[in-house]
Regions:
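Short, solvent-exposed loop/turn motifs
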Residues: 15-16, 104
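Short acidic-glycine loop/turn motifs at beta-strand connectors
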Residues: 10-14, 89-92
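Low-complexity intrinsically disordered segments
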Residues: 35-113
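Short beta-strand scaffold segments in enzyme catalytic cores
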Residues: 4-9
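Short, solvent-exposed aromatic-acidic interface loops
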Residues: 18-29
Length: 113
């Protein structure tokens, strides 16, 4: 079963531009790879400018599907609708998820910094 994630940036207008990542979206994999291999604004832009991401590899490389493009969301809550995690680059990667009660929670990524 896939652990779905949205990955992106916060735009100047307050919206979030996010690309879907299908496999292994949990912080111990995608979060770790983003922090260790894609920890810059330029890298975040590169990720969201392509098609949907199939999977990330431990070395930082990734595979893409042939289709799909970035979506725009008005809030982290919207970006999490239907997804397990949302990763946003704002000076560094931040990770969000919904608790079992529906509250938005930030997941600590400092383990991999």
């Amino acid at each position: 079963m896939a652990t779905r994630a949205n990955i992106g940036i916060k735009l100047d207008n307050g919206q979030y531009k996010m690309i879907y990542s299908h496999w292994d979206g949990y912080p111990g994999h995608v979060g770790k790879v983003l922090v260790q291999h894609h920890d810059s604004y330029e890298n975040a832009i590169e990720l969201i400018e392509g098609t949907t991401i199939c999977s990330f590899h431990e070395d930082g490389s990734y595979d893409r599907y042939d289709d799909g493009e970035a979506d725009y969301y008005d809030s982290i809550e919207d970006a999490l609708h239907g997804y397990d995690y949302a990763y946003v680059f704002i000076e560094q990667w931040k990770c969000y998820t919904k608790s079992m009660y529906g509250n938005i929670e930030e997941v600590d990524l400092k383990t991999w910094r």
